[in-house]
Curated annotation (Swiss-Prot):
Family indicated by similarity: Belongs to the UbiA prenyltransferase family.
Molecular function terms, GO-annotated: 4-hydroxybenzoate polyprenyltransferase activity
Transmembrane segments: 22-42, 45-65, 95-115, 116-136, 140-160, 162-182, 214-234, 237-257, 264-284
GO biological process: ubiquinone biosynthetic process
Membrane topology type: Multi-pass membrane protein
PANTHER family given in the database record: 4-HYDROXYBENZOATE POLYPRENYLTRANSFERASE, MITOCHONDRIAL, PRENYLTRANSFERASES
Gene: ubiA
Protein name in UniProt: 4-hydroxybenzoate octaprenyltransferase
Swiss-Prot/TrEMBL cofactor(s): Mg(2+)
């Protein structure tokens, strides 16, 4: 009995990527950008806890529904062939039940917020649920992932300010560009396998222009973040952090220059530091 419980817990840990927190970081940092700006640097404890836990739960739910959507093809991809729904550690029914539990937990958190934010949360759930299936229907699944990873920023402004100002949409667009850029790097890791099994991605769409498009998206991210700083009259510490982020992007371009799988994956992981550096720049402005 104990062994069975341990096996199920391991399956839950693996399918929700508890052992791989990079996705949580990439979702958390932009949410914190928005929370700090929307709250003038001082989000109340309840707001901070609700959005922090919400990020962890929704990222976990997104991983579960992603694996459910890919359960019939993950075995054909080197990186994903040992996932729980492929190796039999978890059944499809158990995965759907787990997804439902996680969405229920997230909804419980959202009920602590205003009605306008509750309504916006419905969009967040829809984006999280449909993204995994977009890989079969569009060459731009990363666009849907970007929207899913950015929607929490809109919710943060809605809750903290009761409105969604221009700055919120600029941050949303900046994060959208950034997400497409780093997830294209991630898709470059699996590109050869994806072509064979018919899965679509921006890495396949951009083809030989992948590095140039990623660079353009990174420049757009920096330009939009700089514009946010200008609108909010942020000073040199924030500007210095945006310049540092530009340096990190340049390093990522060096990593992906030869399109080697391991290097592309390292470039993807490296984006955690971009999110952190931008957050530090924002936080300093409110000290």
């Amino acid at each position: 009995m104990l062994k069975r419980i341990q096996q199920k817990w391991l399956a839950i840990k693996l399918i929700t990527r508890m052992d791989k927190p990079i996705g949580t970081y990439l979702l958390l940092w932009p949410t914190y950008w928005a929370l700090w700006i929307a709250s003038d640097g001082w989000p109340n404890l309840q707001l901070l806890l609700v959005f922090s836990l919400g990020v962890f739960i929704m990222r976990s739910a997104g991983c579960v529904i992603n694996d459910y959507a890919d359960r019939k093809i993950d075995g054909e991809v080197e990186r994903t062939k040992n996932r729980p729904l492929v190796n039999g550690m978890m059944t499809s029914g158990e995965a759907i039940n787990l997804f439902g539990v996680l969405i229920g937990m997230a909804f419980g958190l959202v009920l602590m917020l205003s009605w306008s934010t509750i309504y916006l949360s419905v969009v967040a759930v829809l984006l999280a649920a449909i993204y995994p299936f977009m890989k079969r229907h569009t060459q731009l699944p990363q666009l849907f992932l970007g929207a899913a990873f950015s929607w929490g920023m809109i919710m943060a402004f809605s809750e903290a300010q009761g409105e969604i100002p221009l700055v919120a949409w600029l941050l949303f667009t900046a994060n959208l560009c950034w997400t497409i850029a780093y997830d294209t790097m991630y898709a470059m890791v699996d590109r050869d396998d994806d072509v064979k099994i018919g899965v679509k991605s921006t890495a396949i769409l951009f083809a030989e222009n992948d590095k140039r498009v990623i660079g353009f998206l990174q420049l757009m991210t920096l330009a939009l973040l700089w514009t946010v700083g200008d609108i909010l009259a942020f000073g040199w510490p924030y500007q210095l952090c945006i310049i540092a982020a530009a340096g990190l992007f340049s390093y990522q371009q060096l990593l992906i220059v030869n399109r080697e799988r391991d290097a592309c994956f390292q470039a993807f992981l490296h984006n955690h530091w971009v999110g952190l550096v931008v957050f530090v720049g924002i936080a300093i402005e409110y000290l």
